[in-house]
Amino acid sequence: MIELTGEQTVDFLYRCYSAVDGLWCMKVEEKYGFDVALDIDNEVWKVFPKIQARKLKELTGLGNGIEALYECLTTKMRLEGYSFEAERVGNDGAFRITIDDCSWHNIMVSSGRKRLSSRVGNKICATEFSVWASEFGKDIQVEQECRICEGSETCVLKFSP
């Protein structure tokens, strides 16, 4: 058996995770069309962020609230290789995440599917991040201020209590 370093293991698992996310969706699209595949993908993203958030809460001992969301979500984004900055906004715990390189959009572009990227981003990103927010408090709101897939230089997400 080959012994991989921790970094190699993470890289391997992340590559597999990324590939299966796109692969199953493409296979559903081949059989049922893009709209059905996008709807099913959206259903998956109504559940998957709950699993991620709950696991990070368990690993860190964090509970609910905007501060715990900030810590867990920025950790998740770092682990997934996002290029982003997070900043506090105001005194109520609100924060903004600015993503300057979106790997999912890049995959859509490199596979010749840029024209579909905004449809995916509009539906899936809205679902993913709102589910993340709800896992830390039912009153936490998320607003997508702009998105790369719609021609902006960055994606900007604002989370507020």
Model-predicted segments: where are they?
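N-terminal accessory segment detector
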Residues: M1-K123, S134-T154, K158-P161
